[in-house]
Structures are given as C-alpha cells and as structure tokens.
C-alpha cells in the first residue's frame, strides 16, 4: 500500500491490469437480431434453435396470409351476387389441412372419431330371467321344509308354529304358479315350457 502514495510506475499499472482471456470464436458467437435490436450469445448446437424460431415466425405469417386470402375471396364473390354460403365448406376440404380463424392449421380428423351406438343392449331376455327367478324360491322352500321337519321332531312349540305358517304359504304359492302364468302371459320361452310337478311334501303334524 505504500507504493500507492508515491508516483505510479508502469510496473504498478501492469499489476492492476485485469486478466482478459481470449475467447475462442468456435465456442462463442455473437449474432445480432436487427428486428429486436438484441444480442444473442450462441454456443455450438444452438444454431438449430434459432432456425426453429425463424421457421415458426414464418409459419405465423403464412397463417395470417391464408386467413386474409380466404376473406378476400369471399368479399369478391359477395359483390357479384353469388351465393357464398357453401364457399367456406368447399375451400378447406380441398386441402389436407384447415385454416381456422385464429390462424392455426388443424388436421381434419372428424371422420376418424369412433361412432358409438345409442341403442340399448339386452343381456338376456325377460323369459329366461323369469325362469331363473322362479327356480330360486323353489330351492329356498325345499331347504326351509327340511329345516322345519327337523325342528318339528325336536318339539319346539313356537318354532313349529311359525315354520308351519311359513311352509303353508310357500306351498300355496307353488301351487298357484301355473294359474299365474296363464293369467299373466310372459315370454314364449316361459309359456311353452311345462311347469315341473311339485313333489309331495310329508304332511306336517298339527300343533
């Protein structure tokens, strides 16, 4: 610090020179953009990014030109007395892409969408469903009858009374099934099928 108080020599100036490293032009390039007035530091491999930006700007300008071209064609036909209602439909279909109003090209893929059928699908007919429902109570009643016979042999008075009433109602329902089928006809599958005869059940002892 003592040398700073006296006269500055050329050797002292060389000590305070900032070290500037020479830049390799192959590693760093300065490209000026005259439209925006900015400098973009570009390294190797980023030239493709700038070319992509240029192509994107050109595509946007082409979209605007396409939109203006369609509107100018409609204005020309409107003054000649020509019906212009079908012109917007014919012009986009002539090409493989459609120029929308916002300047974006969209591919026409409306025909590729799957068409779903709105018709209801029936898994099984009502006749087979009725037949299946008829077989369920019959199996249940047969199991209940066997349980009731065991309880009657054990001698529980209250259980025997309640089961006797239930079994009698079940037998009555089974006997009325043929009459109900004739009174309320259903699918031909159920009508043509003969009703199986009901097996004789052992008479229950009275309480």
Curated annotation (Swiss-Prot):
The record's Gene Ontology cellular component field reads: virion component
Where in or outside the cell it occurs: the entry states: Virion
Indicate whether Transferase appears among the record's keywords.
no
Question: Where is it mainly found?
Answer: virion
The superkingdom listed in its UniProt entry is Viruses
Keyword set, alphabetical order: Virion
Residues folding into a coiled coil are: none
InterPro entries per the record? Corona_nucI, N2-like_embe-CoV
Further information in the entry reads:
The gene encoding this protein is included within the N gene (alternative ORF).
Q: Which family does it belong to?
A: Belongs to the coronavirus I protein family.
Q: What does this protein do?
A: Structural protein that is not essential for the viral replication either in tissue culture or in its natural host.
Put simply, this protein is called Protein I
Which organism does this sequence originate in? Bovine coronavirus (strain OK-0514)
Give the classification, highest ranks.
Viruses, Riboviria, Orthornavirae, Pisuviricota, Pisoniviricetes
Its gene?
Answer: N
């Amino acid at each position: 610090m003592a040398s700073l108080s006296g006269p500055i020599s050329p050797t002292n100036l060389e000590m305070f020179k900032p070290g500037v490293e020479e830049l390799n032009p192959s590693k760093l390039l300065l490209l000026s953009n005259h439209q925006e007035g900015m400098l973009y530091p570009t390294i190797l491999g980023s030239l493709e990014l700038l070319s992509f930006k240029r192509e994107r700007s050109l595509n946007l300008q082409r979209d605007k030109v396409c939109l203006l071209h369609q509107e100018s064609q409609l204005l020309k036909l409107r003054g000649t007395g020509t019906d212009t209602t079908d012109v917007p439909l014919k012009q986009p279909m002539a090409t493989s892409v459609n120029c929308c109003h916002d300047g974006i090209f969209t591919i026409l893929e409306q025909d590729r969408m799957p068409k779903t059928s709105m018709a209801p699908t029936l898994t099984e007919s009502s006749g087979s469903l009725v037949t299946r429902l008829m077989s369920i109570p019959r199996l249940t009643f047969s199991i209940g009858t066997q349980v009731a016979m065991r309880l009657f042999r054990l001698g529980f008075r209250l259980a025997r009374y309640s089961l006797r009433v239930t079994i009698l109602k079940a037998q009555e329902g089974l006997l009325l099934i043929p009459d109900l089928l004739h009174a309320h006809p259903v699918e031909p599958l159920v009508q043509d099928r003969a009703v199986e005869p009901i097996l004789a059940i052992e008479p229950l002892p009275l309480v």
